[in-house]
Swiss-Prot record:
Record's catalysed reaction(s): L-threonylcarbamoyladenylate + adenosine(37) in tRNA = N(6)-L-threonylcarbamoyladenosine(37) in tRNA + AMP + H(+)
GO cellular component, one term: cytoplasm
Sites where the protein binds substrate: T134, V135, S136, G137, G138, D167, G180, D184, N268
Keywords, alphabetical: Acyltransferase, Cytoplasm, Iron, Metal-binding, Transferase, tRNA processing
Protein name: tRNA N6-adenosine threonylcarbamoyltransferase
Gene it is expressed from: tsaD
Taxonomic classification: Bacteria, Bacillati, Chloroflexota, Dehalococcoidia, Dehalococcoidales
């Protein structure tokens, strides 16, 4: 069964064809990073206009790469939230138009669930129950997954998401956008010598990174930071220490079979290394290309929703504030 996935929740226009939820036949992405880097962040109106220019060519390319026609597509999986409203609308309307014209079933996919399904697109299929650490620019969640479509939120950020914290730290240090990769690169040539705080929030699986960001800002303003690379390495280590420790503790408490990593920040080299080395449980870490926004994960998630009987009508709306448990 072939599923066409479409993703346009932020600044990547993507389309993919995935077979049986696990086999990627194509995965095309049109990135807007070079455009938004001029502004130091994503400009919603610019993003939606770029999606309009890219959406149909990207879908066409994905079908051609997969050597698949629309008559072979069993369903269209489309991200309908969370994300930027203007960006989501472009992808959703394109999916609706194709679905209506070709009478193809439509399946709405939660973008956060899609990230988790990166772990079904390589290697060994995950076992339930599993704990997923989903870390991105807008979310930092610990999600217990007891089966397909069964999500329980165990921990979340109380302020800045990990990716958002990296972006803010990069701006403080004068590094480029996007901040996560910039911090990661700078850290390669630095040492974690700064004593930055970690917010553990005893008795909770929640996260908090705003205090860490403020501490870095104060050190920079006081002139105590002499090396940008050392500051980047110190900040990165503080974030990763908290993510890894709280994830492992949560996994042990809920007696899961394995840990899954997902989201854009899952591409961080130190996080990938530390989580795999420190966990006594098996850890599933997606390839770099499946961590950032893409449509293959949307198609995979959509497949499992579709075979369980889930479908959506042409009246489906975008849900910019959708949560992982919605």
């Amino acid at each position: 069964m072939k599923i066409l996935g479409i993703e346009s929740s932020c600044d990547e226009t993507a389309a993919s064809v995935v077979e049986d939820g696990v086999n990627i036949l194509s995965n095309r992405i049109s990135s807007q990073i070079d455009i938004h880097s001029r502004y130091g962040g994503v400009v919603p109106e610019v993003a939606s206009r770029q999606h309009l220019l890219s959406i149909l060519p990207v879908i066409k390319d994905a079908l051609e790469e997969a050597r698949t026609g629309l008559d072979e597509i069993s369903a269209i999986a489309i991200t309908n939230g969370p994300g930027l409203a203007g960006s989501l609308i472009v992808g959703v309307n394109a999916a609706k138009a194709i679905a209506a014209a070709r009478r193809i079933p439509l399946v709405a996919v939660n973008h956060l669930h899609g990230h988790i399904y990166a772990n079904w697109l390589f290697g060994k299929i995950p076992e339930f129950p599993c704990l997923c650490l989903t870390v991105s620019g807008g979310h930092t969640d610990l999600v217990l997954m007891s089966g397909h479509g069964q999500y329980q939120l165990l921990g979340r950020t109380r302020d800045d998401a990990a990716g958002e914290a990296f972006d803010k730290a990069a701006r403080i240090l004068g590094l480029s956008y996007p901040g996560g990769p910039a911090i990661d690169r700078a850290s390669q040539d630095g040492q974690a010598v700064l004593d930055l705080p970690r917010s553990w929030i005893p008795g909770s699986h929640d996260f908090s990174f705003s205090g860490l960001k403020t501490a870095l800002l104060r050190l920079v303003e006081s002139g105590e930071v002499c090396s940008v690379n050392d500051a980047a390495a110190s900040f990165q280590k503080a974030v990763v220490d908290v993510l890894v420790t709280k994830t492992i503790n949560c996994a042990q408490e809920y007696n899961v079979k394995q840990i899954l990593l997902a989201g854009g920040v899952a591409a961080n080299n130190l996080l990938r290394k530390q989580l795999s080395e420190k966990s006594s449980l098996p850890v599933s870490i997606p390839p770099m290309g499946l961590c950032t926004d893409n449509a293959a994960v949307i198609a995979s998630c959509g497949y499992f929703r579709f075979i369980s009987g889930k479908q959506d009508g042409l009246d489906m709306d975008v849900l910019p504030a959708l949560s992982v448990t919605s």
